[in-house]
Regions:
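Charged interaction scaffolds used for protein-protein
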Residues: 1-158
Length: 158
């Protein structure tokens, strides 16, 4: 009888934990739904937050912090692993280009490594915060490159 009770308890507890969403999973799903409702496809996110769509616009860091733009983590959660890197590579490429690196001085490998370093350390930042940083970096408000593209110059500035 005791063995049957333990088996029944084990079965019931598995069913309960399997069917009950946690408050964390509910919050994640709610945020994912908000992002899908606001931006739709990943292409829409890329277009809305692309370097070319930011020309002439300026957002103070306080407003960027309070914005509802998705974070790097939520880009991957909503649109698949690698989405954040895709978005970051576009911006990192823009930064290296504007800072004078041409003719493949900033290789694709350097751009991807820079994007990965940013994502790994700053996964919690939203896209508007990162855009504000990239614009300030381009404006010369942080570290400077010396002769060669160096991912640490960007990550150290961030």
């Amino acid at each position: 009888m005791m063995i049957e009770s333990k088996g029944l308890i084990k079965t019931q507890s598995k069913a309960i934990t399997k069917n009950q969403p946690t408050s964390c999973s509910v919050s994640i799903n709610r945020e994912k739904q908000r992002i899908f409702n606001e931006y739709g496809t990943f292409d829409n996110v890329l277009m809305s937050f692309a370097p070319s769509s930011q020309v002439g616009s300026k957002m103070p860091i306080g407003k960027a912090f309070k914005s509802n733009a998705p974070t790097l983590t939520y880009l991957d959660l909503c649109y698949g692993e690698g989405s954040a890197i895709t978005w970051l590579v576009a911006w990192v490429s823009d930064v290296y280009g504007i800072c004078g690196f041409v003719n493949n001085e900033a290789t694709d490998n350097i751009k991807i490594m820079t994007a990965n370093a940013i994502k790994d350390e700053y996964y919690f930042l939203n896209l508007n915060e990162l855009i504000t940083f990239f614009k300030m970096f381009i404006a010369g408000k942080f570290e400077k490159f010396y002769k060669k593209p160096n991912p640490q110059v960007i990550t150290k500035s961030l």
